[in-house]
Swiss-Prot record:
Belongs to the NusB family. Involved in transcription antitermination. Required for transcription of ribosomal RNA (rRNA) genes. Binds specifically to the boxA antiterminator sequence of the ribosomal RNA (rrn) operons. The gene is nusB. Keywords: RNA-binding, Transcription, Transcription antitermination, Transcription regulation. GO terms for molecular function: RNA binding. GO terms for biological process: DNA-templated transcription termination; transcription antitermination. It comes from Clostridium botulinum (strain Alaska E43 / Type E3). It holds the Pfam family NusB. One of its GO terms (cellular component) is cytosol. This is Transcription antitermination protein NusB. The keyword RNA-binding applies. It comes from the Bacteria.
Length: 133
């Protein structure tokens, strides 16, 4: 099982959940039914934990993000970057299995793939601020 790929898929599913009204169970079910590569490559338990964790702690996660934005409001953050932040903040605040530096580094790697260089610095700054508190 590939944790890096699983984290990336979790972010993609979180992004999809921001665009429609499906809950995490429906989203994950649809994903598993339609995944075209070898599903054994993914840690489905981890993906489910991320989706449920973000969904159940969204208000707390968004509050942590909002408190650590400098001259920004959370509704100005692109949906992709917000999903990356939510995943990473969930791991920082609610998932003791993931070391903090791993959560931040993986978030930055996902940002490099799905966003732009300015976003990498922005997300790094927000996550570092959260980690310091």
């Amino acid at each position: 099982m590939n944790r890096k790929l699983s984290r990336e898929k979790a972010m993609e599913l979180l992004f999809g959940m921001t665009l429609n009204t499906d809950n995490c169970e429906e989203t994950l079910g649809n994903f598993i039914d339609n995944y075209e590569s070898d599903i054994k490559e993914l840690d489905i338990t981890y993906i489910k934990r991320i989706l449920i964790g973000v969904e159940n702690n969204k208000d707390n996660i968004d509050e942590a993000i909002s408190k650590n934005l400098c001259n920004w409001k959370i509704d100005r953050i692109s949906k992709v970057n917000l999903c990356i932040l939510r995943l990473a903040v969930y791991e920082l605040l609610h998932d003791e299995e993931i070391p903090n530096r791993v959560a931040i580094n993986e978030a930055l790697e996902i940002t490099k793939k799905y966003s732009d260089e300015k976003s990498v610095s922005f997300i790094n700054g927000v996550l570092d601020n959260i980690l310091k508190k």
